[in-house]
C-alpha cells in the first residue's frame, strides 16, 4: 500500500527511484547487512558516500551535509522507497540519523566540520549515550555528572544499552551539569571521543543474537572533555535530546508499518483460524498507516504532536509483536525447527523465513522498550491526550 501525494512530492519520489535504478549496488539489494561497524565492507562505505554526494543520504539536510533541503513529505517518500524495497541504507543509522542530526541542529560550525560530515560520509561512527542503570527510559533521571573545571568537563558515571559504542569514534553523551536544578533542566550534551583516557567500553550480547555484540556498558572515570565539545547551551541538553529525535520520531512508525507489510506478503495462512489472525494483522496495518499519515500531515504544517507520536510508538511496536506471535503459532513446531531457529536475524532480508520469524519475534520486545517503553508512552498519552493527573 502506497500513499499518493501532490505532483511535486511524487516527482521527488521518481527522481529518487531513478537514482536507485542507476546506482544501487547489488549488495545493498541483497541485504548483506554488515554485522558490525568495525567490520564494514568497503562497498557499504562507498554506497553511503555516493548517497551523500548525490544528496540522497538524508534528503532533509542541506546539500553540504548530504541532502537537498527536502520537506517532511519528501523525506517520507524517500524513507518509504528504501523500506518498501528493503534496501540497505547506511551502516551507522544512529550516527547518521540522530547524532549528525543533533549537530546540524545544535552544534557549532567546528563540530559540524569535525564530526557531522565525517559521520555522514562514513569516515567516522558515532553512538548515543542516554540510558543508565536505574534511568533507562527516564532520561531526566540520569546521574552521570560532568563538572566544568577550567576549559574542560570532568565526567564520571556509567551508561548502559549503548548501541555500537565499542565501534564508535565518539559518543554523544547526556550528563548532569547542574545537580541543583530541576531534573529536566540540569542536563547537558557532550561529544566524548571514545579514545579519551578513563573511558571504558564493555560490549555484551543480546538475547536474539548472542554472537553479535552490539550493546555496551560505558564507564566514565574522570574523563576530561574539552568545553568546546558541549552541544547546545550548558544545561540545555533536554532540548537537544528532544529536538534531535523530532523528525526521527515522526517517521519512526514507518518501520513498524513496513515490517507488517513484509509479514503480510510472506505469511499466507490457508486454514480458517489463522486466516482470522491474518485479518487482524491487516486491520492493524491499515490502522497504523492511517494514524501515521495523520501525524505526517500535522508535521508537514509544522505541528509535531508528541502525544500522537507516543500513540504510534505504542500501537506500532505492539502490533508488530502480536503479528509475529500469530505467525509463529501458524508455523508450528516443524516450522520453528526447520526454517526459523537456524536463520540469523537480518531485518533487511528479502523474506521473513531468511530473516527468521523467531529471531524477529524476540527482537520485537526491544521495540516496546527502546526509545521509551510502552509504559512511559502510555503515561504521556494519559497526561497529554486524556488530561489525567500524574499521580
Q: Where are the language model's segments positioned?
A:
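Glycine-rich phosphate/cofactor-binding loops in nucleotide/flavin-utilizing enzymes
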Residues: 2, 73, 77-78, 98, ...
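A short, Trp-centered hydrophobic/proline-enriched beta-strand micro-motif
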Residues: 122-130, 174
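A short core secondary-structure module
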Residues: 152, 156-202
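Glycine-rich beta->alpha junctions and the first turn(s) of the following alpha-helix
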Residues: 200-290, 367
